[in-house]
């Protein structure tokens, strides 16, 4: 299965970009929600001493991100993500360094090209995310339902996005559903 996706995508790559650390994100504010910092551009790939933390992004001729290779702690080994674009959704297929399928996700978009839902299924369970926007197109909430291997729903988390008067992101709160507790996971 890996070879099918790799061959299909590799033939469509028209340019590559190299970064130390993750740089591009598919879902809004994903770096802030998980505590990552955006990666740094690598100007000369030949000067890299280790592939750990190396991100190689492949783009097609329409400049769509279609491949992500993530360097891991084992030298010259990568995790692979292949992105396939359709009219109203994008499919992501994620493999580990031994080329085993770990996860498949579907990103659903509305007419404004905003993500509205994400469905994912992996070896350890799955998830469903709903993205809610206000009248000015600002993301205000993500509702994340989590499922175990047997597709039994476990926890539900809510990410709430707060903006300042200039409509700039001010903070992100995380809270479990049906609980008054919330935690600030990012603030400016």
Describe the residue ranges of each PLM region.
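Buried hydrophobic residues that stabilize the cores of well-folded domains
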Residues: 1-188
């Amino acid at each position: 299965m890996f070879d099918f996706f790799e061959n299909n995508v590799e033939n469509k790559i028209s340019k590559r970009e190299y970064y130390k650390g993750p740089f591009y994100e598919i879902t809004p504010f994903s770096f802030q929600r998980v505590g990552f910092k955006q990666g740094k551009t690598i100007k000369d790939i030949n000067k890299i001493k280790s592939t750990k933390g190396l991100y190689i992004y492949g783009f097609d001729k329409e400049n769509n991100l279609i491949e992500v290779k993530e360097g891991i702690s084992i030298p010259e080994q990568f995790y692979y993500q292949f992105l396939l674009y359709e009219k109203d959704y994008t499919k992501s297929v994620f493999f580990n360094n031994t080329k085993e399928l770990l996860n498949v996700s579907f990103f659903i978009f509305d007419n404004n090209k905003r993500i509205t839902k994400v469905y994912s299924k992996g070896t350890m369970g799955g998830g469903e995310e709903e993205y809610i926007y206000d009248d000015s197109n600002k993301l205000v909430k993500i509702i994340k339902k989590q499922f175990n291997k047997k597709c039994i729903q476990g926890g539900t988390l809510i990410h709430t996005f707060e903006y300042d008067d200039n409509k700039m992101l001010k903070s992100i709160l995380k809270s479990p559903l049906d609980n008054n507790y919330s935690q600030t996971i990012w603030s400016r």
